[in-house]
Amino acid sequence: MKRTYQPSQRKRSNKHGFRKRMATADGRAVLARRRAKGRKRLTVSDEPRHKR
């Protein structure tokens, strides 16, 4: 049986990235909430990328 989580950087960025969040009013609200809370990483785009 195939596992449900098949990680891919591109899909992750496209679905949960900064530009996707900024594209809608609700997404901007998410960012505002995370800023207010003091999150170190607002979106998955802010996470360090690992060199392969």
Swiss-Prot record:
Stored Pfam families: Ribosomal_L34
InterPro entries: Ribosomal_bL34, Ribosomal_bL34_CS
Compositionally biased intervals (Basic residues): 1-22, 31-42
UniProt KW keywords: Ribonucleoprotein, Ribosomal protein
Keyword Glycoprotein: no
Database matches in PROSITE patterns: RIBOSOMAL_L34
Residue segments, region Disordered: 1-52
Single GO molecular function: structural constituent of ribosome
GO cellular component terms, semicolon-separated: ribonucleoprotein complex; ribosome
Biased composition (Basic and acidic residues): 43-52
Single GO biological process annotation from the record: translation
Record-annotated membrane-spanning stretches: none
Domain of life, per lineage: Bacteria
Similarity comment: Belongs to the bacterial ribosomal protein bL34 family.
Protein name: Large ribosomal subunit protein bL34
Native species: Amoebophilus asiaticus (strain 5a2)
Lineage of the organism: Bacteria, Pseudomonadati, Bacteroidota, Cytophagia, Cytophagales
